């Protein structure tokens, strides 16, 4: 894992921090990240940004992405561009799994371990689809399509 990934440095990926970044974007402003975390993407979406998937690099599995582009409404961003595309159905569904439970730090003072521990508790109580069930379903779909 990257030193700045959501699991390593959740302070940079909390719902509150991402909402603050989003609020500072001009109309049409873009935030690009290597992260394809459902928690990060769902937080950006709740902050009012339009989400796009960065195109996969050569060798990456089909149907996934190289990251996320989040755009403040009001600009002239097209649905597809030289390095992005709309979310696939798989990516859209990912936002409704336990993986989409956000990292939270309302006061901006929690440690990494506190943020991660609170998220695990929220995931256990949230009632969303387990992420491993989503993964199995999509792996099964891919296996059927390749036959």
Model-derived regions: residue spans:
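A short SAM/SAH-binding and catalytic strip from SAM-dependent methyltransferases
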Residues: 1-12
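Accessory recognition modules or surfaces
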Residues: 11, 31, 59-75
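Short strand-turn motif at the edge of the Rossmann-like AdoMet-binding core
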Residues: 3, 34-38
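Conserved beta-strand signature within the Rossmann-like core of class I S-adenosyl-L-methionine
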Residues: 27-35
